[in-house]
Every structure is written in structure tokens, then in C-alpha cells.
């Protein structure tokens, strides 16, 4: 089973159709009822959930094999109301994302961070919530085709798992592997000092 989160400009039906074609049962999540209605009109066979991911994902532990998020997570870096603190909203999302994924489950998060600091904040919170993984940048030298992905694994990857290779360059994989190593080393250091996965301050 797969779940998805989407921005206000896309809807769960787009990637949901592709996942369904590959035999997956899909649950689409969106903060906009209009986008959910569009997905329903397109004939998405799975379930739809009206939810603000900044308040956490409303699913049981170990529900999903994988998660796809398209152009949504970066919006958690902004505050629309006084009580909305970006780090807290990111923590609510990644903590619940971690626990609703099966151990070893994967999350592919496509995002558009406005600054390097935003990307660092997002990846840092994901790591503190127990994820390993890294950032892949497709076509980094193209303004139109450039895409940034946060590729996450709930827990440590198995030995046979190969991280995605970026499109449009042969050198980007080096930076990605370096970031992934950083994830693993920092995570092991935290565990050595007695911090459990999912503990975020």
C-alpha cells in the first residue's frame, strides 16, 4: 500500500494512477478538498484523506510500504498562523511518516526548497525522526528540468539496497552518497548516546 501527500497545485490522482498501474493500493492525502475531488473524478481507486500533514499523518503504525510526496513538504517551512512553527510542523510530519511506514519502507519526497537552509532544516528533522537516506538532484544545471528529491528509508537500509542515481549528471551521486553517509554516522552517534529513533527536541 502507498500513501501520497500533495501541494495545492497538484492532486493525489496524478501519481496515484501510476502507483495503481503497478498493483499498489493507494491512499491519497491533501489539505485541499478541491484537489481530493479532482482525484476522485479522475477515478482513483484507492481511498482519499483530507488532512494537514503539518499536524501529522493520521495512520496506524506500519500501514504503508511506501510514500510519495509531490511539491508539498517545503510548505511546512512557512507559517500561515502565529502558532505554526515550521520545525514543529516538520517534526509532526516526519515522526508520523516514520511510524506509519513499515520498517525498511521508503519515502520519495519531491520538493522545492527556497533556500539551502530550508533543505538543511527538512533533512535534519527527517534524520532526527529516525530516517536514513539522502538528497538526489536531477538535472542540477537546468533551471526548468531541475528536480530535488529526498529519498528516505524508515530505519537502516538492507545491504542489497541501492540508492537512486540522479538523472542528467554523472557527478551528483558523489554528493548524495556523502550526505547518506552523514545520515548514517549521525544516527549511529545518537543511538550510542541513548537516543531512540523518533526522539526530537
Where are the predicted features?
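Short "lid" loop at the C-terminus of a central beta-strand within the Rossmann-like core
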Residues: 73-75, 112-117
Amino acid at each position: 500500500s502507498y500513501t501520497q501527500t500533495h501541494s495545492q497545485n497538484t492532486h493525489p490522482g496524478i501519481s496515484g494512477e501510476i502507483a495503481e498501474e503497478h498493483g499498489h493500493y493507494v491512499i491519497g492525502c491533501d489539505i485541499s478538498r478541491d484537489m481530493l475531488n479532482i482525484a476522485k473524478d479522475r477515478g482513483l481507486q484507492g481511498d482519499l484523506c483530507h488532512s494537514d500533514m503539518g499536524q501529522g499523518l493520521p495512520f496506524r503504525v506500519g500501514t504503508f510500504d511506501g510514500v510519495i510526496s509531490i511539491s508539498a513538504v517545503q510548505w511546512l517551512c512557512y507559517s500561515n498562523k502565529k502558532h505554526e512553527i515550521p520545525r514543529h510542523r516538520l517534526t509532526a510530519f516526519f515522526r508520523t511518516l516514520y511510524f506509519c511506514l513499515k520498517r525498511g519502507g521508503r519515502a520519495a519526497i519531491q520538493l522545492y526548497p527556497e533556500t539551502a537552509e530550508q533543505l538543511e532544516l527538512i533533512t535534519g528533522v527527517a534524520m532526527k525522526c529516525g530516517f536514513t537516506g539522502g538528497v538526489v538532484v536531477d538535472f542540477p544545471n537546468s533551471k526548468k528540468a531541475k528536480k530535488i528529491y529526498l529519498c528516505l528509508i524508515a530505519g537502516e537500509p538492507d545491504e542489497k539496497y541501492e540508492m537512486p542515481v540522479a538523472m542528467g549528471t554523472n557527478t551528483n551521486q558523489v554528493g548524495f552518497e556523502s550526505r547518506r553517509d552523514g545520515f548514517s554516522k549521525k544516527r549511529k552517534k545518537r543511538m550510542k548516546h541513548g537516543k531512540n529513533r523518533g526522539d526530537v527536541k
